[in-house]
Design a protein with these regions (language model features):
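Fe(II)/2-oxoglutarate oxygenase catalytic core
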Residues: 2-412
Length: 412
C-alpha cells in the first residue's frame, strides 16, 4: 500500500471555485502514476480534495510489473505461483500474468469472467495436479489464493485487478525471494511491524530479532522450569527399541497457553507473523540445553515413509496431508559458546553422512528474544526433506529455547 500523506482536514471543493478545475487536472496526472499501486486510496484522496465521487471502476487496474518484486531467480518454488489478474476486456474476459513456481519469465493466460473457468485455465497452464488417489481426494487441502500480505481470498471479486499468490498446498508461505531479503510484516500483536529476514531459500528459513519480550520470557521460565523432564522423540520405523537419548539429550516441557494471558498474546503474535490461524498451533515446547546437550539432525514434520508401521501416527497426520508446516523457534537466552541451530542441507546440500555433524551448513547463533521461522512443508503441500536441522551441543552456558509448531490444518 502506498500512503501518499496524512488525510487533511475536510474542506468543501466549492470554497475555491477558480482552482477546482486545476486541482482535478493535477490529481488526474498523479492518478496515472500511482493508481496501479492503490486505486482505492487514490479515489479517497481525490474525493477528499475535490468533493467528487467516483465509481469503483474509475481508477481500477493493476500494474503487473509490480508482481516481479516477488519473483526469485534462484530456483523454482514448487507449488507457488504469482498471479496478476486484470479485467481488461469490455466483454468481461480476464487477462492473467503468471509467474509459475515463482520464476520468470511470465506466462500469459486468458479466461472468462468466471471463477470456475479461471481455475480451469490456471490448472491447465500451471500444471496443477489433481489428487492422485482416494486418500488425496479425502485429505489434501485444495489450492488457495492469498494477497501478498497473507490474507486469504475466495471470490473472483476478491482477486480481480490485483496481484495474488496461489499456493497449491492451500496455506500461505512467505516468499523468500533471495537471501538477505527483508519483508516487513505489519501489525503483529504486541510488536507492531516486524522485519522478516531471509536466511535461506532451501530450506526456507527466516529470522526476526526482538520478537519476544523479557517479561514474557521470565513468565515462561517461571511456569516451566520445575516441570522440565528428559526430551522424547517420535520413533520412526526400525528405531522402535532405541532410547531418545541416542539423538536428544535436552529437557523439555509443553507449556499450555491457558497458563497465562501473555502466552495467548504470543500465540496471536505467531499467527500474525505466519498468517496461519492460532488453532493450527501446538502449545510451546520449552527446552533447556545444558553444556554438552544437543539434538541430532531431524525433521519436525512426520514423513509418511518413516511411519508405515505406525497406523496411529499415519491416522493423526491424515496419511501425510496434515503435518507440521512451520517451526517458530524461540531463543530465550544468550549462549556464550555453541548451541547453534544448524541446517546441514542449506543451499541444496546432500544428506549428511552423520546426523551429529555440526561443521557444515547454515548455523544460527542463539540470541535472546530472537526467533527463526522455518518451513517443513513446501508450497505444494509436500514435506521438505531439506528442512533437516539440529541443535548443536552447548559448549559454554545454558540454552533456553522453545518450539512453536504450526500445522497446515487446524489442530483437533
Amino acid at each position: 500500500m502506498c500512503t501518499l500523506y496524512n488525510e487533511p482536514p475536510t474542506r468543501s471543493p466549492r470554497a475555491f471555485p477558480l482552482f477546482s478545475a486545476l486541482a482535478v487536472g493535477l490529481i488526474a496526472v498523479v492518478a496515472a502514476a500511482v493508481s496501479a499501486v492503490d486505486p482505492s486510496e487514490l479515489r479517497r484522496l481525490v474525493s477528499t480534495y475535490t468533493g467528487l465521487s467516483f465509481s469503483n471502476t474509475t481508477f481500477d487496474g493493476v500494474d503487473c510489473t509490480l508482481a516481479e518484486q516477488y519473483v526469485t531467480d534462484v530456483l523454482p518454488v514448487k507449488g507457488f505461483h504469482i498471479l496478476c489478474i486484470h479485467k481488461n476486456h469490455p466483454e468481461g474476459e480476464l487477462d492473467i500474468t503468471a509467474f509459475k513456481d515463482g520464476n520468470a519469465p511470465s506466462i500469459k493466460i486468458q479466461s472468462k469472467y468466471d471463477l470456475a473457468d479461471l481455475k480451469t485455465q490456471l490448472e491447465k497452464t500451471l500444471e496443477i495436479p489433481e489428487p492422485k488417489d482416494d486418500v488425496a481426494r479425502k485429505y489434501k487441502q485444495p489450492y488457495a489464493f492469498f494477497t501478498p500480505e497473507g490474507a486469504r481470498r475466495e471470490t473472483l471479486e476478491d482477486i480481480m485487478n490485483q496481484i495474488v499468490f496461489l499456493f497449491e498446498g492451500g496455506q500461505f508461505i512467505w516468499p523468500g525471494i533471495r537471501i538477505g531479503h527483508q519483508t516487513v510484516v505489519k501489525e503483529v500483536a504486541g510488536k507492531g511491524d516486524v522485519v522478516l529476514e531471509t536466511l535461506s531459500l532451501t530450506p526456507l528459513v527466516f529470522s526476526v530479532d526482538e520478537f519476544l519480550k523479557d517479561d514474557e520470557i521470565d513468565i515462561i521460565m517461571a511456569l516451566s522450569l520445575e516441570h522440565l523432564k528428559p526430551s522424547t522423540v517420535t520413533l520412526m520405523d526400525g528405531h522402535e527399541d532405541r532410547a531418545a537419548t541416542d539423538w536428544r539429550t535436552s529437557t523439555t516441557y509443553f507449556l499450555s497457553s491457558s497458563k497465562h494471558s501473555k502466552l495467548d498474546e504470543i500465540d496471536q503474535r505467531v499467527a500474525d507473523l505466519t498468517k496461519v490461524p492460532v488453532d493450527h498451533q501446538e502449545d510451546v515446547q520449552v527446552l533447556r540445553y545444558e553444556e554438552t546437550q544437543k539434538y541430532d539432525h531431524h525433521t519436525d514434520y512426520f514423513p509418511v515413509e518413516h511411519h508405515k508401521n505406525s497406523p496411529h501416527v499415519l491416522e493423526s497426520i491424515d496419511y501425510g496431508y496434515k503435518n507440521r508446516m512451520i517451526t517458530v523457534f524461540w531463543y530465550m537466552s544468550d549462549v556464550a559458546k555453541g548451541g547453534h541451530t544448524i541446517f546441514p542441507r542449506a543451499g541444496g546440500a546432500p544428506r549428511p553422512q552423520s546426523m551429529k555433524d555440526c561443521s557444515t551448513g547454515l548455523k544460527v547463533s542463539p540470541k535472546k528474544r530472537k526467533v527463526i521461522v522455518f518451513y517443513s512443508m513446501l508450497p505444494n503441500g509436500q514435506g521438505d526433506p531439506m528442512s533437516l536441522h539440529g541443535g548443536c551441543p552447548v559448549e559454554d552456558g545454558i540454552k533456553y529455547s522453545g518450539n512453536k509448531w504450526v500445522w497446515n490444518k487446524a489442530r483437533d
